[in-house]
Amino acid sequence: MMLKPSIDTLLDKVPSKYSLVILQAKRAHELESGATPTQAFTSVKPTLQALEEIEAGNVVIHPDPEAKRAAVRARAEAERIAKEEEERKIKEQIAKEKEEEGEKI
């Protein structure tokens, strides 16, 4: 039985079998958690979908793990700031509405 994608094709995309397994496991976990797929799949299982993405070159190992961690932290910080700003605007709107209610009475 021939596996698709073949191990040889996949090993052309990553430096080692170990790296391939780690990349596949992480991407399969992301897909299972609801990450946006990078392509249409022929497979149903997330593990095989991850291999399809690796074969297509849509998923790669980040060359600098520290830079990736810094980018993830920066994105999380930006999301936190955006959320705080949204909450501040909501509070201002509520205060404004309460002030207008006080003037009407």
Swiss-Prot record:
SUPFAM superfamilies referenced in this protein's UniProt entry, alphabetically: RPB6/omega subunit-like
Q: Which reaction does it catalyse?
A: RNA(n) + a ribonucleoside 5'-triphosphate = RNA(n+1) + diphosphate
Q: Which InterPro entries match?
A: DNA-dir_RNA_pol_omega (IPR003716), Pol_omega/Rpo6/RPB6 (IPR006110), RPB6/omega-like_sf (IPR036161)
Q: What is its EC number?
A: 2.7.7.6
Q: Which GO terms describe its molecular function?
A: DNA binding; DNA-directed RNA polymerase activity
* Gene Ontology CC: one annotated term: DNA-directed RNA polymerase complex
The answer to whether UniProt assigns keyword Cytoplasm to this entry is no
Would the keyword Coiled coil turn up in this protein's UniProt record?
no
Q: What's the family?
A: Belongs to the RNA polymerase subunit omega family.
Described purpose of this protein according to its UniProt entry: Promotes RNA polymerase assembly. Latches the N- and C-terminal regions of the beta' subunit thereby facilitating its interaction with the beta and alpha subunits.
One example of a Gene Ontology biological process annotation: DNA-templated transcription
Q: What is this protein called?
A: DNA-directed RNA polymerase subunit omega
Q: How does this polypeptide assemble, per the annotation? A: The RNAP catalytic core consists of 2 alpha, 1 beta, 1 beta' and 1 omega subunit. When a sigma factor is associated with the core the holoenzyme is formed, which can initiate transcription.
Q: Which UniProt keywords apply?
A: DNA-directed RNA polymerase, Nucleotidyltransferase, Transcription, Transferase
